[in-house]
């Protein structure tokens, strides 16, 4: 049975292209694998607070020296890390806000990127501690030209950041499904959604088969 962790970051529910395509991804996965376990963490309906000074102190305090106050400050981080550890597949859905990710997603990231929990450092090299997982990232941008050799590609700080971050944690198998020009005319929007939806259906069909035991 596959465990899929879905993270939604769009401030919008109605009219959100990233949420819509993530819905399609999940429904497609369940159509192929009805017994899959889907865990949803909506960072807008249930916002993750930004880390505090105590949270950071707790991250770098040896377990034997953790005070009750520090354990409380890192309890949410423990919970979020447990969720991603249990997951076989990670599905991130996020819009591009001002060329980068929403602050809600960054807050979640700051809770799950944690030394000796999701990455290690031996004094010379970093190593990710979450290997063997797949990640799919659905992104939405109002304008076009952010992907490939597009004129706005240098301004795309969503894909390269998330690609590096997930790899840093040991998740090397990352697939992006971007939809662009979501503020264009209706025909262009429909074409863009159809193309992204078709890609998702193809990805899901192949991914579910790969997840199943031989």
Swiss-Prot record:
FMN binds at residues 10, 16-18, 96-99. It is an enzyme of class 1 (oxidoreductase). Pfam families: Flavodoxin_2. Binds 1 FMN per subunit. The keyword NAD applies. InterPro entries: Flavodoxin_fold, Flavoprotein-like_sf, FMN-dep_NADH:Q_OxRdtase_AzoR1, NADH:quinone_OxRdtase_FMN_depd. Its EC number is 1.6.5.-, 1.7.1.17. It comes from the Bacteria. It catalyses: 2 a quinone + NADH + H(+) = 2 a 1,4-benzosemiquinone + NAD(+); N,N-dimethyl-1,4-phenylenediamine + anthranilate + 2 NAD(+) = 2-(4-dimethylaminophenyl)diazenylbenzoate + 2 NADH + 2 H(+). GO terms for molecular function: electron transfer activity; FMN binding; oxidoreductase activity, acting on NAD(P)H as acceptor; oxidoreductase activity, acting on NAD(P)H, quinone or similar compound as acceptor. Keywords: Flavoprotein, FMN, NAD, Oxidoreductase. Its cofactor is FMN. HAMAP family: Azoreductase_type1. Quinone reductase that provides resistance to thiol-specific stress caused by electrophilic quinones. Also exhibits azoreductase activity. Catalyzes the reductive cleavage of the azo bond in aromatic azo compounds to the corresponding amines. Homodimer. Belongs to the azoreductase type 1 family. This is FMN-dependent NADH:quinone oxidoreductase. The gene is azoR.
């Amino acid at each position: 049975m596959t465990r899929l962790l879905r993270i939604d970051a769009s401030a919008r529910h109605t009219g959100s292209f990233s949420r819509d395509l993530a819905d399609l991804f999940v429904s497609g996965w369940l159509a192929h694998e009805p017994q899959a376990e889907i865990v949803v963490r909506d960072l807008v309906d249930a916002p993750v607070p930004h880390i505090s000074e105590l949270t950071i102190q707790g991250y770098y305090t040896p377990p034997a020296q953790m005070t009750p106050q520090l354990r409380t400050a890192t309890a949410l981080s423990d919970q979020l890390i447990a969720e991603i550890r249990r997951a076989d597949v990670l599905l991130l859905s996020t819009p591009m806000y001002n060329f980068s990710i929403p602050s809600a997603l960054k807050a979640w990231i700051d809770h799950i990127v944690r030394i000796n929990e999701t990455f290690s450092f031996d004094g010379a090299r970093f190593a990710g501690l979450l290997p063997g997982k797949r990640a799919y990232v659905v992104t939405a941008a109002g304008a076009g030209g952010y992907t490939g050799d597009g004129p706005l590609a240098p301004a795309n700080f969503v894909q390269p950041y998330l690609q590096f971050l997930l790899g840093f944690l040991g998740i090397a198998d990352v697939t992006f499904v971007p939809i662009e020009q979501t503020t264009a005319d209706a025909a262009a929007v429909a074409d863009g959604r159809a193309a992204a939806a078709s890609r998702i259906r193809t990805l899901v069909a192949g991914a579910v088969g790969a997840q199943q035991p031989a």
